[in-house]
Curated annotation (Swiss-Prot):
CDD domains: ENTH
Subunit-level organization: Interacts with clathrin.
Protein name: Clathrin interactor EPSIN 3
Disordered: region residues: 152-327, 419-492, 538-565, 602-670, 712-739, 884-910
GO cellular component labels: cell plate; clathrin-coated vesicle; Golgi apparatus; plasma membrane
Organism of this sequence: Arabidopsis thaliana
PROSITE patterns per the UniProt record, alphabetical: ENTH
Primary location class: Golgi
Compositional bias of kind Polar residues: 419-432, 460-470, 551-565, 607-639, 648-667
Location of the protein in the cell: Golgi apparatus; Cytoplasmic vesicle, Clathrin-coated vesicle
Basic and acidic residues bias spans: 152-161, 173-236, 246-255, 269-285
Span(s) of short sequence motif Clathrin binding: 403-407
UniProt KW Transport keyword: yes
Record function comment: Binds to membranes enriched in phosphatidylinositol 4,5-bisphosphate (PtdIns(4,5)P2). May have a role in transport via clathrin-coated vesicles from the trans-Golgi network to endosomes. Stimulates clathrin assembly.
Length: 1024
């Protein structure tokens, strides 16, 4: 009686502990089966453990407990013996994976053959362990015996299945190819049905769910109708054919494991597909016969960026957008934009995306065909499998996630063609842009590494036609002939998406010169539905190739075929007009990076060490520039596209040229993808350094604000300059300039004379607008920082580089001196507390001093201590703040309590969350006149191309060639990346908390968000 009572108490105690400690159910069962009780493991526990071995996670828990039990010794010999018993049972009844693991641990089991333990009664209990260990090792080494044992176990299950204990659920056995246990639960009672459903559905999306779920419907399914009711779909949807192609002779119910396997698409049954989709999603899978099955991500996202996988150079199934039918290669394809409207974002098309970590292949989605199909006309989605040339750019996810396609937010309507001619008839209005037709031969969309597409820009020609003005005569550029052999993979997956062909003379794109003024309402229409992260997260779609200027000839884009992302890229053009825009490796006009003025005679050309390119035009003549037009299907948003907005109508044609005509410029040297000019005279510059993917609009007329919500930082610089159009020249007119040098991705002008530089440095992905006329206010709600610099009428950055006065900022953001906040160390707090009497250590003591008679005077001692303490406190207030204070840092090492307690510099700076890589007035990036603690040839600014995964040799921006991973907008750069590397730390160290993978307005000093001048640290030293 006492023994039974003690056993009951132990059981209760064990049960309470397991509940309190939240031990998993399977672990409880294994512990119970291998307990120290004097009886063997219960059959129901063994059955549950064997079934759980088919669940990956439960299998791991089970085996972990068993191997730990096998390591016991001495009086815990029952742990060892029972663990061997459980293993032996699992070899016959559980997953075959157990057999493999037992073989791997055979050495451990073999050592148990010498297990010794003699209990208090003198009985050799170790013999039981020795015999069991020997029998288990012999079993796992005998394949025939294993087969016999497993077949016998299967027969027993079929014979006694009515009395069989309910399994705890789990997945199918990937090793159980013969379907031996398929009939396990055919007539099982209803005990535990609902519980099993809930349990298994919780785990069906687990890590290896698809691997171990092949036979779950054979084992644990009961009734197809019950299954279908639970799944919420009818059996006719799956076209269930009643057999899985294995040894089962009856129809098995549909698994409730998140799978419809490969029955839908006709693929072999052994393809462990995870195709639990319905409706249109399944239709894509059914059409996708020869392709790898889509991933689970498709079941949860309806509109995701499409992606391709051309690793094997095989067939790439493609679904044309609902506004485009995939057709064979055509020589001349005429696309009526008004009819097709490129179906743009307005079509509620479901696009299955592809898991970037799923290695199984491509997904049928609406995306741009590779160099083997063209998409000309609107019909419902059609799957076309076209052999993708192995030489084409792999549209695989690179680590930085489709960098070049960050700014083509139209994932649905992508019109790429490898035909020799494409005519664009009409104009499809897409929210923010005029029509533009181009051929991007080797651009492919990318996957979205952050989940769903950041936005759905829903616009259509019906709603937008009344809001936009035409640019005049639509032009028909002659696209370059596609040559898939010249497509390159640049080191970052497809970081450079707009790759032009290396055939000379194929980009002679000419447009009619009669163009109207850049329409004001072109940017009035705000796409309020566009996410604020639209410029950060990479929606799929190739960036636009910019339209040529009127009467200009596109220079030949010659690309070195080695595919090196840092290879020099030369645009060598015949004498043409100066508005030359060629496709660059960054998917934008070559003018963006050709910061040095077009010269009539480049002596040494422009030298690019790092990912730059050289454009050597022969003659830079005046021309009335045209605002680049781009196709709505190719890209959607000017603020997120890469093209310079150039004024349509100009007072003076020559003054409106974005690149001043330079008679003789010796050399512009690009070292890190940045730009620096050396001007020997007093030239008033307005240098707009436009790194990758920055829309730059220079206009002389009144212009409305960018109306889209991508404009995070707003128009960074809106100087109210003089109305003369000569001030609109974004690049300086330099009669004779020595070589400009770029060191480490910064912009630095060395001006020997009185030059008033007006530098508007903008890192990647920031809209820049320089206007001389009145500027309309931003109409969007996502303009985080607003117009940082005042529009016309306010003194803007035009004089910020030459005078240290504060610049009035829109939104009442002003840089005000911060009061030096006194930091009080702990000793001061204690002294103050004690002096105020807030803490009385003599709470319970007597009022009179009991030791007064022996000469102990506590008051005198206290007074003496306070006198000694006060000088120390005063000294600590001066010197000891190096290691006290702020929560995250050690101060600056300069006797200051941290950056927040210092007065920021008086010259204008752009601020924390405004990632203007080349700030004005020498706060970071440009350091025109105040290169504090920095070499002028090595200004720290932002590596212009760094945000796109380029120029990784200079990630520090200091030209030290040490990629220390300081994350200066390396992570796909986005609006408000802030300064992950604080601008004027002499070391160029990154704050320790700047995550590399974080995009968005991250600032290591103040998190994500707006501008706070207190967070600047003007001194080199410690980082917060």
């Amino acid at each position: 009686m006492k023994k039974a009572f003690g056993q009951t108490v132990r059981d209760l105690k064990r049960g309470v502990n397991k509940k309190v400690l939240k031990v998993p159910g399977i672990e409880q069962k294994v512990l119970d089966a291998t307990s120290n009780e004097s009886w063997g493991p219960h059959g129901s526990l063994l059955a549950d453990i064997a079934h759980a071995s088919r669940n990956y996670h439960e299998y791991q828990i089970t085996m972990g407990v068993l191997w730990k039990r096998l390591s016991d010794s001495g009086k815990n010999w029952r742990h060892v013996y029972k663990a061997l018993t459980v293993l032996e049972y699992m070899v016959g009844h559980g997953s075959e994976r157990v057999i493999e693991e037992v073989k791997e641990h055979a050495y451990q089991i073999t050592t148990l053959s010498g297990f010794q333990y003699i209990d208090s009664s003198g009985k050799d209990q170790g013999s039981n362990v020795r015999k069991k260990a020997q029998s288990l090792v012999a079993l796992v080494n005998d394949k025939e015996r294993i087969t016999e044992v497993r077949e016998k176990a299967a027969a027993n299950r079929d014979k006694y299945h009515n009395s069989m204990h309910r399994p705890s659920g789990g997945y199918g056995d990937k090793y159980d190819y013969e379907g031996r246990y398929g009939d396990r639960d055919e007539g099982r009672s209803s005990y535990g049905k609902e519980r099993e459903y809930g349990y298994r559905d919780d785990d069906r999306n687990s890590r290896d769910g698809d691997r171990y779920s092949r036979d779950s419907e054979d084992r644990y399914g009961r009734d197809g109708n019950t299954d279908d009711e639970y799944r919420g779909r009818s059996r006719s949807v799956d076209n269930y054919n009643g057999s899985r192609g294995r040894s089962s002779d009856r129809e098995r119910p549909i698994e409730d494991d998140g799978q419809s396997s490969s029955r839908d698409s006709g693929a072999p049954a052994d393809d462990h597909s995870q195709d639990g989709r319905g409706g249109l999603e399944r239709k894509f899978s059914e059409q996708n016969i020869g392709a790898a099955p889509p991933s689970y991500e498709e079941a949860v996202s309806e509109s995701r960026s499409p992606v391709y996988s051309e690793r094997d150079g095989g067939e790439t199934p493609q679904v044309a957008p609902p506004g485009a039918a995939a057709s064979p290669l055509a020589e001349n394809i005429s696309v009526d934009n008004k009819a097709a409207d490129f179906v743009n974002e307005s079509s509620p098309q479901q696009v299955e995306a592809f898991d970037e970590f799923d290695p199984r292949g491509s997904v049928s989605a609406a995306c741009a065909p590779t160099a083997g199909a063209s998409v000309p006309a609107p019909i419902p989605p059609t799957v076309v499998s076209t052999p993708a040339p192995p030489a084409s750019i792999n549209a695989e996810m690179d680590l930085l996630g489709s960098l070049s396609d960050v700014f083509s937010p139209n994932p649905l309507a992508i019109v790429t063609s490898d035909s020799t001619s494409v005519e664009t008839n009409g104009q499809a209005n897409t929210g923010l842009a005029p029509s533009f037709s181009t051929s991007q031969s080797s651009t492919q969309p990318f996957d979205d590494p952050f989940g769903d597409s950041p936005f759905k820009a829903i616009t259509s020609a019906d709603t937008e036609t009344s809001q936009h003005q035409s640019f005049g005569v639509p032009f028909q550029p002659t696209p370059p002939t596609s040559n898939p052999n010249n497509e390159h993979n640049f080191g970052f997956g497809e970081a450079f998406s707009a790759v032009t062909d290396s055939e000379p003379g194929v980009q002679n794109m000419q447009a009619p010169p009669n163009l109207s003024v850049f329409p004001q309402e072109q940017f009035d229409t705000s796409q309020s539905e566009i996410d604020i992260l639209a410029g950060i997260l990479p929606p799929s779609g190739p960036p636009v190739s910019l339209s040529p200027q009127p009467d200009s000839t596109m220079p030949t884009s010659q690309f070195h075929p080695n595919g090196n992302s840092y290879e020099s890229y030369h645009h060598q053009a015949a004498p043409t007009d100066l508005n030359m825009q060629g496709q660059t490796p960054f998917g934008q006009a070559s003018q963006q990076f050709n910061m040095v003025s077009h010269s009539q005679n480049h002596h040494e050309g422009m030298q690019f060490n790092n990912g730059g390119f050289t454009q050597q035009p022969g003659y830079a003549g005046p021309a009335t520039s045209q605002p680049p037009q781009y196709t709505p299907g190719v890209s959607s948003h000017p603020p997120s596209e890469s093209f310079p907005h150039q004024p349509g109508s100009a007072t003076s044609a020559s003054s409106q040229t974005p690149y001043a005509t330079t008679p003789n410029v010796s050399a512009g040297q690009f070292d890190g993808g940045s730009f620096m000019t050396q001007q020997p005279y007093g030239v008033t510059q307005q240098v707009h350094v436009v790194p990758s993917h920055i829309p730059q609009r220079t206009q002389s007329g009144p212009v409305a604000a960018f109306g889209n919500n991508n404009n995070i930082v707003g128009d960074m610089h809106q100087p109210g300059s003089t109305p003369s159009s000569s001030s609109q020249t974004p690049y300086p007119t330099t009669p004779n300039a020595p070589s400009g040098q770029f060191d480490g991705g910064n912009f630095m002008t060395q001006q020997p004379y009185g030059v008033i530089p007006q530098v508007h440095g903008v890192p990647s992905h920031i809209p820049q607008r320089t206007q001389s006329g009145p500027v309309a206010a931003h109409g969007n709600s996502n303009n985080v920082v607003g117009d940082m610099f005042s529009p016309a009428g306010l003194s803007s950055l035009e004089t910020s580089a030459s005078q240290p006065s504060l610049t009035p900022l829109t939104g009442a953001i002003e840089i005000v001196p911060q009061n030096q906040k006194k930091f009080e160390p702990k000793s001061t707090i204690w002294a103050d507390t004690l002096s105020r009497g807030l803490v009385n250590f003599n709470i319970s003591g007597p009022k009179t001093n009991p030791l007064a008679d022996i000469g102990v005077d506590f008051e005198a001692i206290n007074r003496k201590e306070k006198r000694l303490e006060k000088p120390t406190i005063t000294q600590q207030q001066v010197t000891s703040t190096i290691n006290m204070g702020k929560a995250m840092g050690s101060g600056t090492g300069l006797g200051r309590a941290g950056a927040g307690a210092m007065r920021p510099p008086t010259n204008s700076m752009v601020g924390s969350s405004m990632p203007t890589g080349m700030n004005v007035g020498g706060y970071g990036g440009m350091n025109q006149h105040q290169p504090i603690g920095m070499n002028q040839n090595h200004p720290m600014g932002m590596n212009q191309n760094l945000s796109m995964g380029m120029n990784q040799n200079y990630p520090m921006g200091m030209n030290q060639n040490y990629p220390m991973g300081m994350g200066m907008n390396m992570n796909m750069g986005g609006y408000g990346q802030g300064y992950p590397m604080q601008p004027q730390q002499g070391m160029g160290m990154a704050p320790p908390g700047a995550p590399q993978g974080m995009t968005g307005a991250y600032n290591p000093m103040m998190g994500q968000g707006g501008y706070n001048p207190q967070q600047q640290q003007p001194y080199g030293g410690g980082y917060r």
